[in-house]
């Protein structure tokens, strides 16, 4: 009974000894077979058991794992939080200073809108110049203006380029060039713009920067200086551009000149008329009756001279008129009319302006000449013989606005038979023949010939004939140009646009496109067997040249036509 119990207890105890590994169990056991205790079982090797014993401290419950994780977080968080707080503090402490400095710089560099737009135009100009250089295209105004408008979303004109050149004249170089226009197949003028960054003097600080950035800073600094010098917001002046692009604005001082002229006119209007004109003339009342009795001798007193006042002043004058400074001579007599008013007839009569106050030169001359024959009266003069009728008795004639007539004709106009007229002195009369008689014969004939040619040029038929002769005289030269051109390109059919373009581009003395087209029409008219025109399906006009025609024959034909046109002039 004991043996089986002991045998059963041995394996149990051996397990505990192996697991616990305590020395008390070794002293208590009295098993004579130690091999069963010392050797481990093959299912559970010793290394695995030792590793399990080492890992037993790690294998904890879920609660302990959570506590261990929490302790680790608490141990790690202060370091990270302190680092993060330091970084945040540094960034928060540095950002206000940076913001303040950036705000100050922005405030310093802030300009009014129109000056700011000019600065943007300059930056876009610099960028467009760089782009055109990378693309290999010429920096002409037509090329860079499109890029500037795309970058700034504003229209870039010649005036903006002139303003930029005024701010930075030494760095911007502008010259006139001729470029080929693909639409018109002609050469047209354009502006070639270049930026010379080496021509500008920089500060010591800006030498370390690139030339492009330094040039922009210099432009902006000069623009700011201009704004400070003109606080009222004046426009930036425009530098003159090469012709025909020099389209300057009207003079800004024109308004000042207009104001000055208007103020002068106001001053002239404020001056009394008595100071401006020294000879006021009193007007006589206009007759309103169909017939008026002649005044008696007691009613009329003739003054001896206009400067010498009469014994008694005039009793009644209807109005005083100050006449503008014209060559009218004052009347040498002054009449006194009684205070009794004239008898007004019941029939209405239209009153007319006195002829002596008309502004026509003929009228003024007539009244001045009519005023001459009146002489001072003496005691033997009969008052009834003196005509005291107002000037309305003169015949009213229609005033002509044609001033082309000679002064001799004007002197004979608008006089009545009842008023004697003094003859004008002969020394006042001057004619063209008398003036020309002083000149030499050759010069006189040359002047008359020029006058005759000027009259002929006014005739459209004569001017057209002269132009035709001039065109025909140039046809032999044009024939040689076209003949050599066709021989060089080896083409007998060419568009008219291309032909005209090649003629103008190859010869600097030929510049008028219209003149070349007229000469081509004359060539087709005179030598139709050599040149003709056809219209293609696309709508272009084709010029066809007959290669079988002899050049000598055509050239002689053109010279003969030229001689026929010049024959009437030689004869």
Swiss-Prot record:
Induction: Repressed by abscisic acid (ABA) and ABAP1. Degraded by the proteasome. The keyword DNA damage does not apply. GO terms for biological process: chloroplast organization; chromosome organization; DNA replication; DNA replication preinitiation complex assembly; gametophyte development; regulation of DNA-templated DNA replication initiation. Disulfide bonds: none annotated. Expressed in proliferating (e.g. shoot and root apical meristems, organ primordia) and endoreplicating cells (e.g. guard cells and stomatal lineage, developing trichomes). Residues 22-38, 288-302 have a biased composition (Polar residues). CDD domains: Cdt1_c, Cdt1_m. InterPro entries: Cdt1, Cdt1_C, Cdt1_C_WH_dom_sf, CDT1_Gemini-bd-like, WH_DNA-bd_sf. Residues 1-79 form a transit peptide. Binds to ARC6. PANTHER family: DNA REPLICATION FACTOR CDT1. This is CDT1-like protein a, chloroplastic.
